[in-house]
Amino acid sequence: MNLKKVHHIPIIGSNYEQSKHFYVDLLGFSIIRENYRPERDDYKIDLQLDGIELELFIIKNCPKRPSYPEAYGLRHLAFAVDSVENTVRELNKKGIITEPIRFDIYTGKKMTFFYDPDNLPLEIHE
């Protein structure tokens, strides 16, 4: 087996404008492609940031996350940052609420969580 890296991470959102604004305008992802899929009546936006590719699907009437944040499947996305404090300040200036900064008990590194418009947990970690 020759797995090299994660190719892309798909995310399902409920609101096209809110999700696009959050990931592009607030977090700084750039748009690679943006497509409406009439056969599914949904949108697919491919985003990229520093080698990370997200597929953002906007699908009407999907069920909400079943629990916070413990549910089978993907638990959250974690982004590496140089400084959690600086990143928290930047997020807060943009109106994004973050949880209190804490230390990862296994690595001793600072970390915290914030949430996308559909309450997908996102982590920043030094």
Segments the model singles out, each with a brief description of its role:
Residues 70-85:
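Mid-chain, well-packed structural core segment of small domains
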Residues 5, 41-43, 73, 108:
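Exposed loop/turn and edge beta-strand positions of beta-sandwich/beta-sheet ligand-binding modules
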Residues 1-2, 46, 88-126:
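Vicinal oxygen chelate
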Residues 11-53, 93:
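Core segments of cupin and vicinal oxygen chelate
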Residues 1-18, 74-77:
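N-terminal beta-strand motif that seeds the catalytic metal site of vicinal oxygen chelate
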Residues 22, 85-90:
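Short amphipathic alpha-helices within nucleic acid-binding modules
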Residues 32-34, 40-42, 56, 61-67, ...:
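A short, acidic/glycine-rich surface segment
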Residues 54-56, 124:
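Generic preference for hydrophobic
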